[in-house]
């Protein structure tokens, strides 16, 4: 079997001075040699068959095998998200509304009324502010959690610490929601303490669980396999990652659907039960973690590449200046090969660089992913509304003894139904017909339909204003029934369309965060995606003073318009990435672009993916 060296040395070589006598078909002969190389199968270091260039573009791609530990991690995510969302879904009513008149003193409402469950009675502005503070912290702490796992503790230990903190938070929330505490007016302090601790635990957990899941797939690069029916296919880690991410996000929303139990608990029994049920489900977490501990593929902390990451950017800034930042090839100035070609081997002042050319490519991909995540805050505002505005909107509609926050759960239910359709129906069908519905197209589509969700919210709010007994001051109305003659089920399209958008945006973002990050920064880059939610919460926090009647239509209209314009800009800015055949951190070449011989050999021998193989498993 010919190697790269064989292919090159077997081609005719002509000295510079004899080029005039070279045969006319020189280019054709060299092209023929490389073409022959392209079509020769090769084995990787594990003896697995790698595809030729022709096979890479013609064979159908499928998922590789998925270990059972990956499914157990998805189950762990279910338990954590169920306990998290089970609490979060009732935060709004707990803070905004007072204890209902004629209720049981635990926050539940009398039967047969249109009253809303409540406890503290602080109003929409305070409720939204505290909810956004919680969300901001829960999605800011992951930045620290990702760094801690990458550099100090590893993913598993960091997750275990987060789970312990999570348990303390659940206990504080339950104690603060006891009827005796609420009736004495002392519920605010334990609630605030509880959500702060809950945000810390969730942040440590969330930034590391999806990278740990994707760590369980140990296949690196493309592999050719013959199926029992004789069809030759490519086992593609990108497809495997997509399937894992879909399963993971599906379990996130199965857990979120647990909010259905807590919303009915607050309505019928009280908040002590609404917070107590998530705590019971939380108890599954330490048991499941103990069960899979010795079976997991664990990557030890190897020190974050964050320092090198910034030194690469700093070197490029010094050599290229700020004006050209972001242009194609900007970071190439930091490549050791470029520095050597220009007669220098130092970063600056003769100090040798401690990275290679491949790491600079990793930095490029990571920066692209992080800039993509900057578009997500506006999308998140469209997916569920600003603050607690949509839950508050439901309180001004006819509920007929249903909780006003029940429809939150239909977002999760929609995701649960949509993910299998995409995973086992739509995406395989597209791949079978060689239709590449790339990550940028998926995210753009999600952005657009989320904007539609906000537009529907604006129409619903307008109808409430037009039909409410209090007109354009419908929130907290006490005239007549106090609600507009509109069923709360008018909100259903908002939640369902938002759920569909998440299947395209959030799932794809998880894939990008993991696949485009350097090996020692995967937790940190994943946390950058999560931090987009924190930025969204900060934007929403700035908007909370405007969440008052008669202006509640505009918090839906503005994100819808911005989201539509942003989606168009986003697609034209990043559409080239749909042709980028990234495979788990960059192994692969641009689709349709013939890679260099050196790059092909690097891929086939595994050189380009050595950084992804840890020195040990612990």
State the predicted function of each range:
Residues 32, 229-232:
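Acidic, serine/threonine- and proline/glycine-rich intrinsically disordered low-complexity regions
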């Amino acid at each position: 079997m010919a190697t790269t060296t064989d292919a090159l040395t077997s081609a005719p070589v002509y000295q510079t001075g004899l080029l005039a006598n070279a045969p006319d078909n020189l280019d054709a002969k060299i092209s023929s040699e490389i073409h022959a190389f392209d079509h020769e199968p090769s084995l990787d270091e594990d003896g697995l068959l790698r595809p030729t260039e022709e096979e890479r573009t013609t064979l159908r791609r499928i998922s590789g095998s998925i270990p059972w530990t990956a499914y157990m991690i998805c189950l762990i995510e279910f338990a954590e998200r169920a306990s998290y969302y089970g609490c979060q879904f009732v935060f709004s009513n707990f803070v905004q509304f007072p204890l209902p008149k004629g209720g049981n003193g635990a926050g539940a409402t009398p039967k047969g009324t249109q009253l809303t469950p409540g406890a503290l009675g602080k109003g929409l502005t305070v409720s939204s502010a505290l909810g956004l503070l919680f969300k901001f912290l829960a999605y800011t702490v992951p930045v620290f959690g990702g760094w801690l796992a990458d550099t100090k503790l590893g993913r598993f230990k960091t997750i275990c610490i987060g789970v312990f903190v999570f348990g303390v938070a659940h206990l504080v929330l339950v104690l603060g929601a006891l009827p005796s505490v609420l009736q004495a007016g002392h519920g605010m302090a334990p609630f605030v303490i509880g959500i702060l601790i809950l945000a810390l635990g969730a942040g440590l957990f969330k930034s590391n669980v999806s990278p740990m899941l994707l760590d369980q797939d140990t296949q690196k690069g493309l592999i050719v396999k013959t199926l029992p029916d004789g069809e030759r296919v490519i086992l593609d880690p990108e497809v495997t990652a997509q399937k894992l991410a879909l399963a993971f996000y599906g379990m996130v929303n199965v857990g979120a659907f647990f909010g259905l139990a807590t919303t009915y608990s607050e309505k019928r029994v009280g908040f002590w039960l609404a917070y107590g049920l998530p705590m019971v489900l939380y108890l599954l977490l330490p048991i499941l973690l103990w069960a899979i501990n010795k079976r997991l593929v664990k990557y030890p902390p190897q020190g974050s590449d964050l320092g090198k990451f910034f030194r690469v950017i700093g070197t490029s800034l010094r050599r290229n200046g700020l004006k050209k930042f972001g242009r194609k090839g900007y970071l190439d100035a930091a490549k050791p090969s470029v520095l050597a070609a220009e007669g220098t081997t130092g970063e600056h002042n003769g100090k040798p660089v401690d990275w290679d050319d491949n790491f600079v490519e990793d930095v490029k991909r990571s920066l692209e992913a992080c800039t993509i995540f900057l578009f997500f805050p506006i999308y998140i505002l469209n997916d569920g509304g600003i603050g607690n505005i949509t839950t508050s909107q439901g309180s001004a509609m006819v509920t007929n003894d249903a909780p006003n926050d029940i429809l939150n759960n239909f977002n999760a239910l929609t995701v649960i139904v949509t993910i299998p359709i995409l995973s086992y129906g739509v995406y395989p069908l597209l791949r079978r017909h060689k239709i590449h519905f790339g990550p940028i197209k998926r995210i753009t589509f999600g952005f657009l339909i989320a904007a539609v969700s906000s537009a529907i919210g604006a129409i619903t709010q307008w109808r409430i204003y037009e039909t409410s007994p209090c007109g354009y001051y419908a929130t907290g109305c006490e005239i007549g029934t106090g609600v507009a003659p509109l069923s709360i089920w008018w909100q259903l399209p908002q939640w369902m369309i938002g759920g569909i958008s998440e299947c395209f945006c959030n799932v794809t973002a998880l894939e990008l965060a993991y696949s485009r990050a350097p090996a020692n920064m995967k937790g940190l880059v994943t946390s950058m995606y999560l931090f987009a939610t924190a930025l969204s919460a900060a934007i929403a926090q700035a908007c909370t003073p405007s969440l008052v009647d008669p202006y509640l239509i505009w918090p839906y209209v503005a994100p819808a318009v911005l989201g539509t314009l942003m989606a168009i800009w986003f697609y034209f800015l990043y559409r080239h990435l749909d042709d980028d055949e990234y495979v788990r951190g960059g192994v692969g070449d641009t689709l349709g672009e013939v890679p260099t011989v050196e790059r092909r050999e690097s891929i086939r021998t595994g050189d380009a993916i050595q950084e992804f193989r840890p020195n040990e498993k612990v």
